[in-house]
């Protein structure tokens, strides 16, 4: 069904507009939905079991193409071709053209154009089912069904070959034999004509008499409809009520080769109760095509009360007049049956349709035996029939419609008897009513079956014909008087013996004889069919063929001949002047005899005219056979001969039987000549018969011969002579009248030709105008198609633009969401980095606190160490002083003992012992390591950046070693080697060592800063930490250095005193003091350290040049004493005492000079140290300021980042709130909320808007709402109640009939219909959604299960309603999140 529901935008829209053009009613019937329209349409049931929708497909005037790729109706299903078939609608008549594809109607396959009838089921392809609905036709059919009658049965009931079909309530067995159809091999046109002719000839044969004696089926108002449900037939009352033509017609299929599609129209049927429905002529049934009759039909005058009949009704009435049983027996058993069938076959040829009329046969009714009684026996003649009105209700379809000619008042009978011409007119319609016209059946197959069954029957013997005198047991109106008169009359006896009367066969060449039945007794009407049927082919005398009839006072012969009657006669007419009434009156008898004589003359004239007609038929058939030259060319002359023999069969049955078998082989001319000779002989016999019949009739009614009567006989003979004279005059008069009739016929022919010319001109104009109308219609259709295509293109472009806009909008939203995600990720990263920095700052502060505490501890330790070192130094100085004094004493004693001889050289031994006592300390290496460890970072310092080694006195090695050990213990930083350091190798008495005074020295701050800045690989925090540590270390060393300087000053003063004491001692020793003896220790006297300054100048200067930062130790010039021995001679020999005083003075001066230099150097060093401290302090301040600035920048950056993050989050929240489809308010749950004040505060003019009634709790007003089940727009009264917390809507403002309720908890969103979704056309099952009445005023209320579309009466009302409803949208819970 998906494919079916894709009914494609183009055709779907067209179908919708087509359906919308006509009135389409949607009616709710309880749970169901009824769709009704007035135009013919198809109801599509889908293409299979999976299809669920029902589609209405309208069938407009013209052609509608159906297929899988058709432009009109596109269907998808198995077996459907692109253009499967098409349906043509011509003024309400719809015809299906299969186009060679698989199509079935009610299960029967269709191969040729077929007319569609109301309610039929179409199957296209394999499983695409469609039901055809024709509302106008259905309405008309309903009007024709009588009250209480059942609905029509299923149409298209197939007729099986070997079964009995119920037709008109009678069982008619069908034989399976099918006549051979002549298939010519030459041209297609000739073969088709011959085939149609053969089928029509085969179909002319009457029913086989196998159903004799069967009782009719149960009567019902409607018979089974074998003709597509179009013929509504009433069953006959008796077996005589069935007509042969109607039985063929009713069992015919929907379309025969010679019938137009419109020929299967329905016909009204009278119910048994006699109720007459309204006018039953539908407007949609067109006239028959001209294959049966010419279009020119003069208007027919009717008596008062006569109603016009459609051609179908007239034709139907023609079928319903059955022949008599005598005719049945005669046509069935005599060779005339075959002749009649062949003649009738010839009349059905479409080639002769406009020229050769159908043969109408007048037959008299004769009683037959029970063996020959047919189901078509009819009531007796209206002249002998008592007034029984019962058959009126059940016989024939048209009995109630046209008034019977016998309903005329008796006055009309008197008028008719005034003149022979009037009698002639009256007779015309008496016989015209008795004329049996045969309708060609529309089913050739049934006709052929009947023909074959007829040919198999043996001919009727004369004895059987004579036995037909007994009355019929099955007569509907048995009349003893009729039976007696039939038995007493000699002429019926002779006619029954011969099989037929002279008037039995009246072949009327009138194509409209079966179609237009003239119920009114006017000559114009009886001539009308003939004028319309001939084109000048026949002689003018043809028109008298239907004038055989009876005047109001008829002879018994004619009365018996008219006993077949017309079934349309509902009531009988009372007989006037019958033979029984005038048997006692001689004048009446003479008048009666005169009338009989005139009748016989008239009948002879009729026979002559019938012969002329037969000759015309023969000529036409011979001409047709010569023109065709087909297979039937040899058979057609025998048709004419057999037809002529049919006229003689009544008088000479044996001769007719004998001649019928052998005459077919004779030549046409010989057979025709013999026929005319036999007919002339039969005329003479007939005249003699009439005379004897009159005489016997007079003899029957004479009571007893008397003398009186003999005189009367003479008078009667005289009178008879007069009457004969009158008869001659009347004959002349009759001839004149015939001439007048011929002239009038010629005039009528001329009139007909003129009218035909005018009609052709009018038809040409009509066709021209019709073509113009068709062209305009095509232009209109093309214009509509173009407009529709343009509209579709615009809609497609709009849809494309809409999709493009939606894609761009979606991409924009994607970009925004991506940017928001990136911002969010960046903000999170910044927040994480900020948190890490804050944690790092906290850790740094903790480490700084730890380092501060460590620095404090180091300072305390340094103070303690300095105090301990000062104590040790004082103790060592006291020991040194004691040892020196001891040494001096020893030297004096040695001098005194040895007589001035010096001590032996023991300097090297002493130094070796000192080396053994003190561990060798690489002071230079320790100094370099200490300075490198105090540097900033792992980068190697250059040799120029590290301070040089300093010379020191050997006596201070132990102290320096201890200070080094303490420094290693208290230093928190690892010491690393800074590379190879320059070392100076001094003399054996001195070594390059670091003095304690150098502890206060450090590299310049510039080099420290440069080194710090050069270490880019260190993190900032580590560099700052190291800088802090370096600063604190420098401060600690500065304090330490100041303490050491003070200590050195004190020691300088003490050394000055000691030097003065030593100089005094040396002076004393030089001036005669005894030398000291050597101590027990064996140590030689220690050489003064000032001698070290008298080393070679080059070495001293080289060391000074190599070490620019090095200076002399403060102890180097603290002694004022002079050394006793210089160089390697340390003894104070007496030889040198003379020059010692001069040298001592020079040394003292030099020492003072050196002391001054040392003081100057000391001051310079102090100033430089102060400058360094100041620079270091400034650098620290700058670093502190820079760090504070960086921290402030970091704090401001983090604050700004925090503000940015908060701002972004706020922006997103704001955008999210703005993206809500709600208006600017959220649902308000407060109980004391004033709705009117709230709406007025929003800027709405409530008082000026007349469409809304607003109070503090309730809002009321009209809105147009789209329905849920049926998508149509209805005006509803809406009530928004905050007390009940509902939005309900009613039919009107009385609020009595509630249509629906929307609870506040279900309302999710209220928004303007900006997408115009309510204005788009869509399909909901098979109902169409019409677009919004005003899309600009449409808004939507979304609930959990449905979306309501509402249209406000004005823009202000729409805004008020949206703001009102949104205060109750409690289903919108997103804002709570």
UniProtKB/Swiss-Prot annotation:
Among SUPFAM superfamilies, the record links this protein to:
PH domain-like (SSF50729), SMAD/FHA domain (SSF49879)
The chain's coiled-coil residues are 683-809, 1144-1208
The UniProt keywords, alphabetically, are: Coiled coil, Methylation, Osteogenesis imperfecta, Phosphoprotein
Phosphothreonine modification sites are: 522
**Amino acid composition bias (Polar residues), ranges on this chain:** 165-178, 288-303, 1009-1018
Modification Phosphoserine, positions: 51, 192, 220, 223, 324, 334, 381, 404, 430, 443, 461, 470, 489, 501, 518, 520, 533, 539, 551, 555, 563, 578, 583, 678, 971, 1017
For the modification Asymmetric dimethylarginine, the affected residues are 131
Cysteine disulfide partners in this protein: none
Give the record's GO CC terms.
basal cortex
Residue(s) carrying Omega-N-methylarginine: 512
Every FHA domain range = 64-125
Might you name a Gene Ontology BP term for this protein?
A: regulation of microtubule cytoskeleton organization
One Pfam family this sequence matches:
PH
Please list where the region (Disordered) is annotated.
150-187, 211-334, 370-535, 653-707, 936-1019, 1119-1138
This protein's name: Pleckstrin homology-like domain family B member 1
